[in-house]
Amino acid sequence: MLFSKLFAPTLKEPPKDAVLKSPKHPGKAGYIYQIGSGIYNFLPLAKKVLDKIENVTHKRMQEHGAQNILMSFVVLASLWEKSGRLDKYGKELLVFKDRKDNDFVLSPTLEENITEIAANFIKSYKQLPVHLYQIHTKFRDEIRPRFGLVRAREFIMKDGYSFHEDAESLDKEFLNTQSAYKEILSDLGLDFRIVEADSGAIGGSKSREFVVLTECGEDTIVVCQNCDYAANIEIAKRSKRTEPLMSPSALAKFPTPNTTSAPSVAEFFKTEPYFVLKALVNKVIHKDKETLACFFVRGDDNLEETKALNTLNLLGANALELREANEEDLNKAGLIAGFIGPYGLKKHVCYIIFDEDLKEGDCLIVGANEKDFHAVGVDLKGFENLVYADIVQVKESDCCPNCQGALKYHKSLEVGHIFKLGQSYAKSLKASFLDKNGKERFFEMGCYGIGISRLLSVILEQKSDDLGCVWTKNTAPFDVVIVVSNLKDEAQKKLAFEVYERLLQKGVDALLDDRDARFGAKMRDFELIGERLALIVGKQTLESKEFECIKRANLEKQTIKDIELEEKILEMLASE
């Protein structure tokens, strides 16, 4: 490719709203162009990178037995209604009507579509297992698109779905796809972790995220410093804590004027917040109503909203989301902020859940459900039919549930997610097959996704520097850019074109910078665009028969003799 023919409209300054490297560098380098909030055009350089990411993905998925298909971007809303997700997914789901007043959705995920295909064409266990995948455009109506392609509204996604006759077969494919994803991300040169995760709106019994560690990450993962335990903070667990020493006290009610927070209550009674029962009241949003739930945790813990919501739904609440109850909500329920406790609480709220760390809770200080009063010496074993669950957010001071090692937070970006869906979609959409005994059974399903366009951003966040884009071995738009020092020197120009042809013949993806521009400007574009190598052709090259070669990853310079040029270039490209 000749640079003079390349459509790469570079800018003097990055886009004004670009904060991170991933929208800043490709925006300035002419990779992408934003035409709306969270909506981007991919120009030739970005399309080359995306194609390379997709090629790696296709190769590894097909090596692991998956078959490539292409599904409709537009799906009947009635399918989403059958699965129950039309309301559950929320406002991020874009719903529209056609001219005949039929409802459709722009797909953010395709569980309903693929299940409909399976229901119509997979009739026997003999056709199982099967794993189908696609790479296609998706749409999610994000309320606040941010970080460029990391959190865009329109994006490119690799979606995969597998169908099985039993859970054992699904387990095998889950691990098979996990291996494929590890190979894909390794081929792309990323430093990543696999963590236990929440299934979110997609649902399912088990899920794992593939995350890339980066300081600009929008997610927090919890990692053990001693073993391989890692989990998204939304579901992270900890080992049972050692209880501080506390002298037993008799059950009594004390006046505690204006003492409404766990730390202030602990200070008032000269004890640790650990022994204070903290009440957190939330509004539970259902499809057609709102209720109240009260969650109890120790005073030095915080509620993890995802765990709390999942626990409610395990109890049959069919909750869509949680919102913190305000003073008006509490007043309507007859509750007093700062003094809420378990005594007589059932008449005020619909759901009461205690963190599992409170199962043996005694010597507790709790709100008396009376203004300016707390009860001390409370033993929860004296209450009947309490519901316990893991609802707290793990802290960095907590210990690993596997080995007791120290847990630490890391910022990360999710790039892939795999789920065991079980039979949930098959049951709701009536997708079944005949087993070996001739009995009708529902499919066991798996779901597997990788953010293709997000990977473009993530690679830049992890690899780039302040000068511009740095790509990995299998993702750079060009292997080599040939930079002519003085294009008006016919000898330099002639040699540059000869070298260009020599490299093309060896299969090197080369770009010849034949623009009539200053040498410094060309080198700045090399640093900005991020070809893997820059090969300099100048006056000294003509005299010494040696080329200066610069690696973009670390800007390391190397001298290469003309006679060894192709061999050395291929070695350098293979080694990174």
From Swiss-Prot:
TM regions (residue ranges):
none
Give me the disulphide-bonded residues.
Answer: none
SUPFAM superfamilies per the UniProt record, alphabetical: Class II aaRS ABD-related, Class II aaRS and biotin synthetases, YbaK/ProRS associated domain
Q: What is its EC number?
A: 6.1.1.15
The molecular function terms in GO held by this entry are: aminoacyl-tRNA deacylase activity; ATP binding; proline-tRNA ligase activity
Per the record, the GO terms for biological process are: prolyl-tRNA aminoacylation
PROSITE patterns, alphabetically?
Answer: AA_TRNA_LIGASE_II
Sorted UniProt keywords: Aminoacyl-tRNA synthetase, ATP-binding, Cytoplasm, Ligase, Nucleotide-binding, Protein biosynthesis
Q: Does the keyword Lyase apply?
A: no
CDD domains in the cross-refs: ProRS-INS, ProRS_anticodon_short, ProRS_core_prok
Q: What is known of its domains?
A: Consists of three domains: the N-terminal catalytic domain, the editing domain and the C-terminal anticodon-binding domain.
> Which family is annotated?
Belongs to the class-II aminoacyl-tRNA synthetase family. ProS type 1 subfamily.
Listed under subunit, the entry gives: Homodimer.
Q: Could you identify this protein by its name? A: Proline--tRNA ligase
Source organism: Helicobacter pylori (strain J99 / ATCC 700824)
